[in-house]
Amino acid sequence: MQTIPLRATANQTLQVVLDGQDCSLRIYTRTLSDGGDTLFCDLDIAQRPVFYGAICLDGLPLPLYPWLGMSGRLVFVDMQGTAAPHWSGLGSRWRLVYLSPAEAEAYAEGRRL
């Protein structure tokens, strides 16, 4: 498991190598019709799109499907509960972690990491 450093800003782009994959992540906030801020994520690996516009939720692995071209999964983790991440708490309350393929499989099966 690898923690990806995030800043408490509404929009950010970062480059990180995850399990040998050159990843470009874009985390951004959109205000939805209910007036609440919602985080979304885009991911490119080696300058090739893997997914765009994925909603960021606590505990939801990204990408949702293994055939999208990423080895392993990204997961937002709420360190204080189970709320959807908000930009103001990124890097502290909400952390983004990378799970290797074996860790992602264990996570999907509900096993402790």
Predicted regions span which residues?
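Short, charged/polar N-terminal "headpieces" of proteins
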Residues: M1-R26
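Acidic, aromatic-enriched beta-alpha/helix-loop junctions
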Residues: T31-Q80
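Structured beta-strand/turn binding interfaces of compact recognition modules in eukaryotic regulators
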Residues: R7, D19, Y28-R30, D44, ...
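Short beta-strand/loop motifs in extracellular/secreted proteins, especially
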Residues: Q12, L39, W94
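C-terminal charged interaction modules
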Residues: H86-L113
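Short, surface-exposed loop and linker segments with low hydrophobicity and enrichment for Pro/Ser/Thr
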Residues: L18-D37, W87
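Intrinsically disordered, low-complexity segments enriched in polar/charged residues with Gly/Pro
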Residues: M1-I4, Y28-T29, P61-P63, A83
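Solvent-exposed, flexible loop/coil residues
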Residues: A8-A10, D22, G59, Q80, ...
